[in-house]
Amino acid sequence: MKLLILLFWLIIVFTQTILSQTSIVNVNSYDIDAKLTLNSENLDITLLCQIQPPDSLSEIQFIFSSESKIRSIKYLKDDNWISIPYQFNGKDSLLLLFESGILPDNKYDLRFEYSFPTNLLKDSLVIIDRGHRWYPLMLDQVAPFKFTCDVPKGYQVFAAGDLISVRDHKDNTTFLWESKSAVFKLPLIIFNRTRFKEAAFDSLGIVIDFFYLNADSIEASRVIKEAANSIKFYSEHIGNYPYKKLTLFEVTQWEGINTGSGLIMIGTQSLEMMKQKYYDALNLTIAQQWIGAGVFAKYGSPGFWFLSLSLPHYLRLMYLRQTQGEEYFQQTLKEPLEKYKEFAGKENDIPLINIDSPNSREKGLILYGKGPFVFSKIHKAMGDEKWLSFLQNLYKSFCGKILTYGEFEKQISRYDENGSILALLKKLITQKGIPEE
């Protein structure tokens, strides 16, 4: 049952974004100012985005919701805001046209003024994520951000990163969220606080907040303490958690878990599993705060899913080894691997390096079954001390940055004196099945 739920979560959450894109422009930062009023179904947004092209360009392609109502798009030139012609050249595909072109390596500030539709008046809850394309983005880019959101009094705002300030006014409240470390996505939750119950816990100076609907205080306390234990483990073994806060939020709209940097949205069905003390998905999304939502694999490139899913799964197993013991670790490693072996080497099998999306049961099992097995072999070949040193250096070098598979191999080579570990890794991820040793 646990295996099926976790595989279902893999398929649901990670198939929201299927469009592949390799950007030719670097996104340096976002500064977003948003406002929501009770008499409007739209989120009014002014967004500043700094870009830096590596080459001379006359046009730039963004992924951006076709449902947005754009008022203007401009760029800053000689202290003046100049209008940019634009057009949607496909669904959620926004093309900016620079009549005089833009120069390589220069930094350009873009300003987008637009409104994005919400359903606040229908159910008093706004949940939008990267897959909604609510802000202009490039799929393979990460960037730091600052986000200011003004909402009606009594409403709360959650985003990625840290909550910097809350300012109360007569009829409204202004929230400021920020991440100085780059993030892969900007989720946004706006909700009526009175409808949710809250639990909080302080661990290692990190405030863990849990907002929930379908649990009692004892169940919520167990969930939040499990999250705290996971954070403690990864902080001690890999490196410091990059934020002062982690927010857990129950969502009734889907069944799985959606993870962002500092924000984890828990579907009601997943919460039911946690209430029964099955914490697999929670442990995974906590691990992803280090690798997945802390260190970011290069989206759309070979090895993306192996690094962003299989590696966090193995980190989860490392936590289980310490908390549940070696026998439980081996059992949990073996269970999905046996499921994978049922079709290993056959038509539905795919080399790990070639998986483009976990959009089938078989692909999910390859990532969740074979993937962690591969990391267990690399761990064993390195030895405990070198393996932990490898993880710590990987995190230190790439937290808030994009990690390509090539860079991942370079990091491994520092702990591979005779090349045997890289040779083993290449064999395991480029071939179908479980190659004989």
Task: Please provide the spans of the model-predicted regions.
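N-terminal, polar/Ser/Thr-rich
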Residues: 16-44, 69, 139
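Amphipathic alpha-helical substructures
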Residues: 364-437
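Post-HExxH zinc-binding segment in Zn-dependent metallohydrolases
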Residues: 263-264, 268-269, 302-343, 421-425
